Every structure is written in C-alpha cells, then in structure tokens.
C-alpha cells in the first residue's frame, strides 16, 4: 500500500521509480494486491498503472478523492479494464447501525442531517465544536486543495459565493445564466462561463453532484437546468450557517444520495409543466420517485401524485415522505 501524500513515499513520485519499486517487491507465484491512494500526484502515473495492469499476478486498486483520477489519458488507457467503485458518506441506515437498537429513529434522523453523515463524526458527535472544526477542515481541504489549487482559481471569494448559492439552493432547478444574473444583482458580478467552470470544478471534487433534467414523455435529456446536491447535508451549516431550515430539500438531498449509492443514472424528470424529483435508469429498467416532507395535506398529496400518474409507462413509481401514518 502506498499513500502519495506521505513524505516517506516522495522518492516514488515519478512513474519509472514507482514501477521499479513495486515490481521489485512483488511476490512471485502469488497474487499481489496493490493499493495506491492519490496516485495522480505521481508524474506520469498513467504509464505506471498501465504497465502494472499487464502483470498477471497483480490485483490493483487505485483510490482518489475527486474525478480527476479517471479523466483524460488514464480513462483512455484503461477503457474496459477497470471497475469504478463509488464511495459515499454513511447512508441513514448505516448511521442507525451505530446506535442502540431501541434508538428513536426521528431523533436519529435529525442528528444525521444536522451534524454529518461522515463516519468520523460518529466518534465526536457529542462535541459540537469538534464536529464543526472537523467539517470546516474537510470543507477547506476540498475547496482549497482540490478546487482552488487544481483549477488555479484566483478569486476564492467568488468561488465561495457560488458554493454558498448552490448549498442554499439544493433541490432547486438551477440555470447557469440565472446563477450569474442573481449573483450580479447582489453585487458580485460574475460571467456565466466562470460560473460554469466553478461548478464543473466543484462537481469534479465531489462536494456537489449535478443531476440533469429528463423529459419523461419525450424520453430525452433537456439541455438547460440542473439540480445540485451536497455530498453531506451537514456541510450546509459550515457553508452558509443554515440549520434546521428547508427540510423538504434536505430530505430530497438524502434521497438522492441513497439512490446514487444503489447505482444507475439519475435524472430530474419533467412531464408537461410538472416535475418528477428523480428518474432512475438502470439498463432497461426505470423507476420514478417523488419526495415530500409530508403529504397529509390533500392538495400536497394531489400535487405529488399527479406527475407520477401522468407518466405513460408501467415502471415502478414511488412517493417518499417522512409521514409515519399507519
């Protein structure tokens, strides 16, 4: 196992040195399991990985905290020869498993969305200040290291304004030009192409996920408007200080992450003027999901069900809510 953020491994930050070191230490006649973390720090790492892939006695695992690992040349070299395993913070079910079997589920859910779904937070969750320090450090690492440094962004304050906008609008349809116009009207003038570049950097760093829109009747992707979701809703309190508000969109964020864990392509559905929160496509199969904090109100129930009822197919359709009525 080699972690390339460890100074002890600095001599191997060159693909030839890395390949020679690994090959020299392989056990002949046995399967060798190799784990490389943040290997993109190695100059020319693609060549080392490609050569190691050619060895019959090597099972290779490469981990990274952003999408740059599988971009460009490495994706071309390894096409069809790798399996991508996406990792997420804890699901609510996994979070519950850390608690006593008789824990109150509603209280656990409030804690889950207010504190964090990152595993380490479970060890420090009773110390609110330590949780905040941990999440702040995590956020700064992602934004400053993965985004600012890699994209060579000079206006960090503008980038953070975009981050705050996205965090404040999770679950809302966002159009690049509208984001630009809104921020400009608030005194932060920014061009549409800059907003687009910043959002691309943020989604590549996995702090946000983008979900494109899909015409459920015409069965085609729409070119404008996407929704954005945070990798962890607990980060909202670090980004913009919100606590306890907008619970409907927070629930939608939680559902999105759960669907992403289960695999498939995820879209925001559109049918006429109505919206379907999520359309999940897995091969030939589809499923449709509406998410609402509560549907005890008759008008709300009708509003949530009508788009599902208007879809002209027989794939499964679900309405997810926090209501616990029998």
Indicate where each model-derived feature is located.
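Accessory nucleic acid-recognition modules appended to NTPase machines
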Residues: 128-286
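Short glycine-rich substrate-engagement loop in P-loop NTPases that contacts/grips substrate
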Residues: 1-33
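Interdomain motor-coupling "hinge/lid" segment immediately C-terminal to the ATP-binding subdomain
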Residues: 65-67, 71-173, 209
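Conserved ATPase-coupling elements of RecA-like P-loop NTPase cores
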Residues: 9-13, 39-49, 53, 72-73
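Structural recognition of the conserved hydrophobic beta-strand(s) that form the central parallel beta-sheet
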Residues: 35, 59-65, 86
């Amino acid at each position: 196992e080699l972690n390339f953020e460890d100074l002890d491994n600095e001599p191997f930050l060159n693909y030839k040195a890395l390949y020679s070191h690994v090959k020299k230490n392989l056990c002949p006649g046995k399967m060798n399991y190799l784990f490389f973390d943040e290997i993109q720090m190695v100059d020319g790492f693609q060549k080392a990985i490609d050569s190691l892939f050619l060895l019959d006695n090597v099972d290779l695992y490469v981990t990274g905290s952003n999408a740059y690992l599988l971009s460009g040349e490495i994706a071309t070299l390894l096409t069809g020869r790798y399996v991508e395993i996406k990792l997420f913070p804890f699901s609510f079910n996994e979070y519950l498993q850390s608690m006593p079997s008789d824990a109150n589920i509603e209280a656990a859910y409030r804690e889950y969305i207010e504190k964090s779904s990152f595993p380490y937070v479970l060890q420090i969750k009773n110390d609110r200040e330590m949780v905040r320090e941990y999440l702040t450090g995590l956020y700064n690492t992602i934004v400053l290291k993965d985004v600012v440094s890699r994209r060579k962004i000079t206006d960090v304050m503008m980038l953070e304004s975009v981050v705050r906008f996205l965090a404040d609008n999770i679950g809302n349809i966002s159009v690049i030009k509208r984001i630009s116009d809104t921020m400009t009207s608030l005194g932060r003038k920014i061009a549409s192409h800059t907003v687009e570049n910043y959002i691309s950097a943020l989604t590549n760093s996995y702090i946000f996920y983008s979900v494109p829109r899909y015409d459920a009747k015409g069965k085609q992707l729409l070119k404008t408007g996407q929704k954005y979701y945070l990798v962890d809703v607990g980060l909202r309190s670090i980004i913009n200080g919100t606590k306890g508000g907008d619970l409907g969109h927070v629930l939608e964020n939680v559902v999105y992450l759960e669907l992403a864990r289960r695999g498939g392509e995820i879209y925001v559905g559109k049918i006429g003027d109505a919206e379907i929160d999520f359309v999940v496509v897995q091969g030939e199969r589809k499923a449709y999901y509406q998410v609402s904090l509560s549907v005890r109100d008759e008008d709300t129930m009708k509003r949530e069900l009508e788009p599902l009822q208007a879809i002209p197919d027989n794939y499964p359709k679900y309405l997810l809510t926090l209501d616990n009525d029998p």
